[in-house]
UniProtKB/Swiss-Prot annotation:
Gene3D superfamilies linked: 6.10.140.1470, Cupin (2.60.120.650)
Free-text cofactor note: Binds 1 Fe(2+) ion per subunit.
Short name of any one Pfam family annotated for the protein: Cupin_8
Domain JmjC, first and last residues per copy: 106-268
Example GO molecular function: iron ion binding
Highest classification ranks of the organism: Eukaryota, Metazoa, Chordata, Craniata, Vertebrata
Protein name stated in the entry: tRNA wybutosine-synthesizing protein 5
Function description: tRNA hydroxylase that acts as a component of the wybutosine biosynthesis pathway. Wybutosine is a hyper modified guanosine with a tricyclic base found at the 3'-position adjacent to the anticodon of eukaryotic phenylalanine tRNA. Catalyzes the hydroxylation of 7-(a-amino-a-carboxypropyl)wyosine (yW-72) into undermodified hydroxywybutosine (OHyW*). OHyW* being further transformed into hydroxywybutosine (OHyW) by LCMT2/TYW4. OHyW is a derivative of wybutosine found in higher eukaryotes.
Length: 326
């Protein structure tokens, strides 16, 4: 999309824990990490190997007649397949057997044993495969939350969303494009909960979403073996350029009591944020008691108060000050 400011995600090589914590993590910005050892999976996780090791255990997958997943209109269904059959279908362009159409797309986001209570953990759900994947030790073991297996058909695009925990996306096989947007640009993304309504980020409907052009677009291409550090609250949209296998590793970077204890997916807002949003809804209900012009006026006052009280103020550097005064 040419009308958006486009920025490259910085790339680092041969990063160890010390370098990550000193030079990358404090910036709270995405970073591509190359040549970080993640185990033999980059070499061994072929379609045949995955099918053999994963076997016929059943997995619940997304099936869509088109590669761009649409959470607004739910253009996908959930179906259960043996893992080896799923792998075979996800890797092929045309399917002799199918649910919707012969060119349907598949997407797996692995779940815990009891999806309502347990987070996904590659070591528990796929122990035969987990031994080939080494979790980068960029955080303390007690901070670990989940390791999520992600497998996509070629061309599959997942909608723009944010997560409330820091995470590393390990691209094991295939290439993937990732587009990210800063939390500061949330006002331009037309959010419904944790997701952006702008599904086609490459050719958006600017009559429907005119503010979207103001969002700065960070973009990178992940190669097999690459890691992408995605800080919490950064919006991201993924496009599988090839059949792809990856692992998302999430960890708690806030105190454990900040998170909803009944959230096995790790995507619920922090407890305090949830309370604040609930209070906001009650406040908006009170504003509805006012005539429209008064409601508009006091809503604007409230926005100003939130900006002055809660927004992070960025320091103005000397060069910017001089340019502003000349």
């Amino acid at each position: 999309m040419d009308c958006q400011e486009k920025l490259e995600v910085p790339v680092y090589t041969d990063v160890d824990k010390e370098t990550f914590l000193r030079d990358i993590y404090p910036q709270r910005r995405p970073a591509v990490l190359k040549r970080v050892p993640i185990g033999p999976c980059v070499r061994t996780w072929t379609v045949c190997f995955l099918a053999e090791k994963g076997g016929d255990r059943e997995v619940k997958v997304h099936v869509s007649p088109e590669p761009r997943m649409d959470f607004l209109h739910k253009n996908f269904v959930y179906r259960t397949l043996p893992f080896d059959e799923f792998i075979k279908r996800a890797a092929e362009a045309k399917h002799p057997e199918f649910f919707i159409s012969e060119d349907e797309s598949y997407y797996l986001r692995s779940l815990g044993e009891d999806a309502r209570k347990e987070p996904a953990d590659l070591r528990k759900q796929f122990p035969e495969l987990a031994e080939d994947f080494h979790v980068p030790q960029f955080f303390e073991p007690e901070q670990f939350f989940s390791s999520v297996f992600r497998i996509s058909s070629p061309g599959l695009q997942l909608w723009t969303h944010y997560d409330v925990m820091d995470n590393l996306l390990a691209q094991v096989t295939g290439k993937k494009r990732v587009v990210l947007y800063s939390p500061e640009d949330a006002l331009h993304l037309y959010l419904t909960g944790d997701k952006s309504e702008v599904l086609d980020i490459d050719s958006p409907d600017l009559q429907l979403y005119p503010e979207f052009v103001k969002a700065r677009r960070y973009e990178c291409i992940l190669e097999p073996g690459d890691l992408l550090f995605i800080p919490a609250l950064w919006f991201h949209n993924t496009l599988a350029l090839q059949f792809g296998v990856g692992v998302n590793v999430f960890w708690r970077h806030l105190p454990s009591e900040s998170y909803d204890k009944k959230d096995p997916y790790g995507n619920k807002d922090p407890v305090a944020a949830t309370r604040a949003l609930q209070s906001l809804e009650r406040t908006l209900g009170i504003l509805d008691e006012l005539p429209p012009d008064y409601r508009d006026f006091y809503a604007r006052r409230m926005v100003l108060r939130i900006q002055s009280r809660a927004y992070i103020r960025k320091p103005i550097n000397a060069a910017q000050e001089n340019s502003d005064t000349t």
